[in-house]
Amino acid sequence: MTRLKDKYLNEAAPALIEKFKYSSRMQVPKLEKVVLNMGVGEVKDNPKAMDSAVNDMTLITGQKPIVTKAKKSVAAFKLRQGMNIGCKVTLRGDRMYEFVDKLFNVAIPRVRDFRGLSSNSFDGRGNYSMGIKDQLIFPEIEYDKVDKLRGMDIVFVTTAKSDEEAKELLKLLGMPFSQN
C-alpha cells in the first residue's frame, strides 16, 4: 500500500468522519482519479514536439499518455480536424496515490516563489484544477534533455459532494493551500 493511501485510510478518513458527521464509512469522500493534460500547440510547426511531450509525461506519471486530436478545424490557429494537439493521462489506484504524493511533497515545493495553491480552483462539485508552468519541477525530468518548457493542467476528481468537503480531503492528504 502506498504511503498516501495509508495516510488517507488511517488519518484523513477518520478526521473527515468526525468533522462532517458521516453515518457510514462509504460516505467519506475519496480521491477518484487524477487527470493530467498537456497541450502541445507547437506540434503544427514541429511534429517532433509531440514525441517529446509524450516522453516527458510518461516519465512524470509512469504511464503512457493518450494523444488528443482536434475535434474541429479552426482556421485562425491553422488547425485541421484530427490533428494531434496534446496528450493526457488518467491515473487511478496506486499510481494515482504515488503521483499525488510526489506532487505534494517533491514537485510543488520546487516551484520558485511558491506561497501555496489557490483555494478558488474548485468547480462546485468537489473537483480541483491546477496548472503547472513547466515540467522541470518533477525530479524525473532532466534539465539538459528538455527541448522546450511545457506546462500542464492537473485535475483532482473526488467523490466529495461539495467544495468544502473536497478542500478538507485534499488538505488532509497534504495539498499546500495558501493561507489567505
Curated annotation (Swiss-Prot):
Domain of life assignment: Bacteria
SUPFAM superfamilies, alphabetized: RL5-like
GO cellular component: ribonucleoprotein complex; ribosome
MF terms in GO: rRNA binding; structural constituent of ribosome; tRNA binding
Keyword RNA-binding found: yes
GO biological process, one term: translation
Alphabetized NCBIfam families for the sequence: PRK00010.1
General function of this protein: This is one of the proteins that bind and probably mediate the attachment of the 5S RNA into the large ribosomal subunit, where it forms part of the central protuberance. In the 70S ribosome it contacts protein S13 of the 30S subunit (bridge B1b), connecting the 2 subunits; this bridge is implicated in subunit movement. Contacts the P site tRNA; the 5S rRNA and some of its associated proteins might help stabilize positioning of ribosome-bound tRNAs.
Subunit structure: Part of the 50S ribosomal subunit; part of the 5S rRNA/L5/L18/L25 subcomplex. Contacts the 5S rRNA and the P site tRNA. Forms a bridge to the 30S subunit in the 70S ribosome.
Family, similarity comment: Belongs to the universal ribosomal protein uL5 family.
Protein name: Large ribosomal subunit protein uL5
Organism: Ruminiclostridium cellulolyticum (strain ATCC 35319 / DSM 5812 / JCM 6584 / H10)
